[in-house]
């Protein structure tokens, strides 16, 4: 059973008109994720690869009923992007950016908790529920649908573990890279729910 994301996930890509945001928005869409919109200040009303672009997260959530966001903005803007997403009503926020000042992450994390949302990252590869949805920069082709949960602070270690699991016919329900920075949103303890995953 997948956790956090599935076929009902409706995703907004913050920073969708940037190089990384656009590249990975296309990859997530190709995987089957419902990428319902993106944000880029000043570019609202346009679209990229058939994905509508909004000026703010408030507009994006109101128009698309999104419940998840992924952040591809420069580190100096990332904390504000996290808080904007939470304030707009997003329930799950994934921050890929690295190099965000620790105090900014602490402030953003506290704000997210106050809003009742969840933060994965920063400095993380995101998460995937194989065959259902991917929110991040993971190589979807190495994953196999199954019942093993994978949780790691390291993106490359996650891929290595999953490669060997898949090669041995052990599919994954959800794989999550929680991020390698000193301060991250969800921790191993938060995510480890043995009642929902047969193996972790």
Predicted regions and their residues:
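Residue-level detector of conserved catalytic or cofactor/ligand-binding positions
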Residues: 187-200
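Rossmann-fold NAD(P)-binding glycine/threonine-rich loop
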Residues: 99-117
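NAD(P)-binding Rossmann-fold cofactor-contacting core
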Residues: 30-48, 179
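Glycine-rich, highly charged phosphate/nucleotide-binding loops
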Residues: 48-63, 70-79, 187-188
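Short glycine-cluster motifs
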Residues: 146-188
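Rossmann-fold NAD(P) dinucleotide-binding segment
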Residues: 63, 76-97
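Generic hydrophobic/aromatic pocket-lining and core-packing "Φ" positions
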Residues: 25, 57, 82-86, 162, ...
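General beta-strand structural signal in soluble alpha/beta enzymes
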Residues: 13, 37-40, 93-95, 118-123, ...
């Amino acid at each position: 059973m997948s956790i956090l994301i599935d076929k009902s996930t409706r995703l907004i890509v913050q920073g969708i008109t940037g190089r990384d945001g656009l590249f990975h928005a296309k990859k997530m869409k190709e995987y089957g994720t419902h990428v319902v919109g993106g944000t880029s200040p000043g570019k609202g009303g346009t679209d990229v690869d058939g994905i509508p672009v909004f000026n703010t997260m408030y507009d994006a959530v109101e128009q698309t009923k999104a419940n998840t966001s992924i952040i591809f903005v420069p580190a100096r803007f990332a904390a504000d992007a996290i808080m904007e997403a939470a304030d707009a009503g997003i329930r799950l926020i994934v921050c890929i950016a690295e190099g965000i000042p620790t105090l900014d992450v602490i402030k953003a994390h506290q704000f997210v908790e106050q809003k009742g949302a969840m933060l994965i990252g920063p400095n993380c590869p995101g998460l995937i529920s194989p065959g259902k949805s991917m929110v991040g920069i993971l190589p979807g082709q190495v994953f196999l649908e199954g019942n093993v949960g994978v949780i790691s602070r390291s993106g490359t270690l996650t891929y290595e573990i999953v490669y060997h699991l898949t090669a041995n016919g052990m599919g994954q329900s959800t794989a999550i890279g929680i991020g390698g920075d000193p301060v991250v949103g969800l921790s191993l303890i938060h995510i480890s729910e043995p009642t929902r995953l047969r193996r972790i």
